[in-house]
Amino acid sequence: MNYPHPIIAREGWPFIAIAAVIALLIHAVGGFGFAWPFWLLLVFVVQFFRDPQRPIPAQPNAVLCPADGRIVAVETAQDPYANREALKISVFMNVFNVHSQRSPVDGAISKVEYFPGAFLNAAIDKASTENERNAVVIQTASGKTVTSVQIAGLIARRILCYVRAGEPLSRGQRYGFIRFGSRVDVYLPLGSRAKVSIGEKVYASSTILAELEQ
């Protein structure tokens, strides 16, 4: 699948431009000795908004990771967006991870729902239910329900979602972005087999989170 997005996310272009102008102005006035922290900030902002293409596994029953980060939960939990018991897998993104979100499965969106909330540390469990979040509920062609939830964090305070109910999604398709550290929860049907463990480093689209029961 082609990834029709620039390697530096458009969401970051204004921040990069501002950081570059500040660094250039301070360098022009005070030289590199004064400007180096601002050049360093520019490098950080550029790396934060990187958005590389990733290989997408072809395995038909695979649930792909929706974001880069580290696994912080693999457990049975209530999926409040689809009213069911589910297998929940949570990915925590720190400020050094890629922050775009990509669809874990092929399917059609049955619901997109936004919830205002707090901005707790996204690595802790109660962030799933108390923080600002946006849920995308996807129905696969085989009738399976997969819920992907963008969750704001302590630093991240802007969730961007570019899809609506009724639209199709393809596995690996970019559908959202969260700025500056956050979390994504994925809820799967009971009977799905987790393929990751807590503490594991994962990558959007290329890591298989789980396998749906066939």
Swiss-Prot record:
EC number: 4.1.1.65
Cofactor field: pyruvate
UniProt-recorded Gene Ontology molecular function terms: phosphatidylserine decarboxylase activity
Positions of the catalytic residues: 182 (schiff-base intermediate with substrate)
Note describing how the cofactor binds: Binds 1 pyruvoyl group covalently per subunit.
Iron-sulfur found in the keyword field: no
Site (Cleavage (non-hydrolytic)): 181-182
Keywords: Cell membrane, Decarboxylase, Lipid biosynthesis, Lipid metabolism, Lyase, Membrane, Phospholipid biosynthesis, Phospholipid metabolism, Pyruvate, Zymogen
GO terms under biological process: phosphatidylethanolamine biosynthetic process
Subcellular localization, as worded in the UniProt entry: Cell membrane
Post-translational modification: Is synthesized initially as an inactive proenzyme. Formation of the active enzyme involves a self-maturation process in which the active site pyruvoyl group is generated from an internal serine residue via an autocatalytic post-translational modification. Two non-identical subunits are generated from the proenzyme in this reaction, and the pyruvate is formed at the N-terminus of the alpha chain, which is derived from the carboxyl end of the proenzyme.
Record-linked Pfam families: PS_Dcarbxylase
Known function: Catalyzes the formation of phosphatidylethanolamine (PtdEtn) from phosphatidylserine (PtdSer).
Oligomer status and interactors: Heterodimer of a large membrane-associated beta subunit and a small pyruvoyl-containing alpha subunit.
Xref: PANTHER family: ARCHAETIDYLSERINE DECARBOXYLASE PROENZYME-RELATED
Protein name: Phosphatidylserine decarboxylase proenzyme
Organism of derivation: Burkholderia cenocepacia (strain ATCC BAA-245 / DSM 16553 / LMG 16656 / NCTC 13227 / J2315 / CF5610)
